[in-house]
Each structure stands twice: as structure tokens, then as C-alpha cells.
Regions:
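Active-site-proximal mixed secondary-structure blocks
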Residues: 1-109
């Protein structure tokens, strides 16, 4: 699967399905290392004429350290064939193993 950026205004998918049923990854970088986790809780909307997404991340999650340390993060949507990988990335901590490598994911900046 090739990586390509999708502008939010070009998104033709049902965001409720993307968030609640299909899930997605949130990833951030800290000190040259990237961590990711599966997200199934989020809201999307418009705030002060800007498109926004708010993602719920528990304070004790390892990924939160990366989000707090970074000015940016990415949200990545996958097709249904990646559901098993998304389940894995949502249950295993990056503190314990390299989820990105074990999932055969590629980081693209």
C-alpha cells in the first residue's frame, strides 16, 4: 500500500465509520523515535472556521508522551484488511516492543 496525503476536504468516507468501526492509527515522534497506537475514540468538526480532530488518549498511554513532545502528529486510515494489525497496535505498548517494525509499517515524513 502506498502512502498518500488526503486533504480533509477531499475525504469521501463516512468519518463515523472510520473512527468507530474501521479505526485508525495516531503516530508521533519524540527524540527521533516514532510510536503509534490505534484510535477508536475521536471527534471531528469545525472550530473557529478550522477543521479539527480531537483524539482521546489516556494519560498513561506511552503514545501520549510522544504526542506531548511533538508539534505534529499523523492520523492514518487503513482499509479493512488491516484490522488485525490495528488490533495489535491497540493492545501492545510501544514501551515493550517495536509495534511499527513488527507490523511491517513504514514511517514516511
Amino acid at each position: 500500500m502506498a502512502f498518500h496525503e488526503i486533504k480533509v476536504n477531499d475525504l469521501n468516507e463516512n468519518v463515523f465509520n472510520l473512527i468507530g468501526k474501521d479505526w485508525f492509527l495516531i503516530s508521533a515522534e519524540k527524540e527521533g523515535t516514532v510510536n503509534t497506537m490505534t484510535v477508536a475514540w475521536a471527534t471531528v468538526g469545525i472550530l473557529w472556521q478550522k477543521n479539527v480532530v480531537m483524539v482521546a488518549v489516556r494519560p498513561e498511554r506511552y503514545t501520549k508522551e510522544f504526542l506531548d513532545a511533538s508539534d505534529t502528529f499523523s492520523l492514518t486510515v487503513f482499509d479493512k484488511s488491516y484490522k488485525k494489525m490495528l488490533g495489535y497496535c491497540g493492545t501492545v505498548s510501544g514501551r515493550d516492543e517495536d509495534k511499527i517494525a513488527k507490523s511491517n509499517l513504514t514511517i514516511n515524513h
